[in-house]
Amino acid sequence: MIVRMWMKRALGAAAIVLVTTACGQSPDNAAQPGPTTGTTTTATAAPSGTTAASDPVVPEKLRFSAKTVGGGTFEGASLAGKPAVLWFWAPWCPKCQREASGIAAAAERSEVAFVGVAANDTEGEMRRFIDERGVGGFPHLADEQAEVWAHFGVAAQPAYAFISSAGEVEVVTAQLTEQELMAKVAGLT
């Protein structure tokens, strides 16, 4: 029992350190654009279950439910059969703050579904970020325990999950410029 409790605390502390250092910057370079290098992983979400002929099969990666900022419920299955972008962010992340206007513009110009997945802060701070950064044009999840992040293998922000209409998922853990984001989005349609 003590060992299990110690392991949970150690893993929790390691996760906090990882997330904190992944988005931190010194004040000297906080206003400069960050590098766009990062990690990309691709997975094909294997369909499971049966559906009616007119309903798309829900890939495993889209089998999740989460609370939205504002208190509603979002079902990942609602994205089945259509291209989508999940944007993983945190309210205090300077890279997320810088890329927010580009995300909003890409979501507005695209037919692809966008969903923000906020973690590592309170719902109140998430709401403030959405309002101040102008990214309220698409749903945002209040993933306070980072469960959706873990479901997609995301450990740091900013990150993206690009989901094809066939359910293939490409996770990119890097800050993207608006042009890089639009190129990725164009590849989904």
Locate the predicted segments by residue.
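N-terminal targeting signals for export/organelle localization
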Residues: M1-R63, M182-T189
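Short, ordered coil/turn segments that flank beta-strands lining enzyme active or ligand-binding pockets
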Residues: V69-G70, S165
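Short active-site neighborhood of thiol/selenol oxidoreductases, capturing the structured segment around
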Residues: E75-Q97
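Hydrophobic beta-strand anchors of alpha/beta hydrolase catalytic cores
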Residues: V85-L86, F114, Y160
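Nucleotide phosphate-binding site architecture
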Residues: P94, A104, E170
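Structural microenvironment flanking redox-active thiols in thiol-disulfide oxidoreductases
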Residues: Q97-R133, E144-A146
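Thiol/disulfide oxidoreductase modules built on the thioredoxin-like
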Residues: D131-G137, D143-T189
